[in-house]
Amino acid sequence: MTREEGRRAARRRAVILLYQHDVTGLPFEELIENSECAGEEVGEFTRALTDGASLDREYLDGVIDGAAEGWTAKRMAPLERNILRVAVHELLDHPETPEAVVIAEAVATAQRFCGPDAHRLINGILGAVAREREETTT
């Protein structure tokens, strides 16, 4: 498995763990243990994304709300909301990853697992977050 494939899988695992937590309320350690018992590797990058997105959830939801025209994070389906949380966290706290990669991975995850228009919403919100980030750093 290449580094990119490993990071793609780690992002998807983080989204799934956050989604499961949102829906079930189970603690992350229990969800991680269940994943590992099922033979899924929960590596360092998955844990970093999961921890960061869960600890900064309110802040990330505020960023999402600010970038989403006519939407709030609370109104979104749990899967879309958690794809955005992971991606926004990575955009803001993992500058070593190119913005285009973060956005493309989030859009691909939405295309694979969400409804037919979810990827457009996610692309638009992440594009707005990236533009805002560029404006504040220049």
How should these model regions be labeled?
Residues 1-138:
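N-terminal interaction/assembly modules
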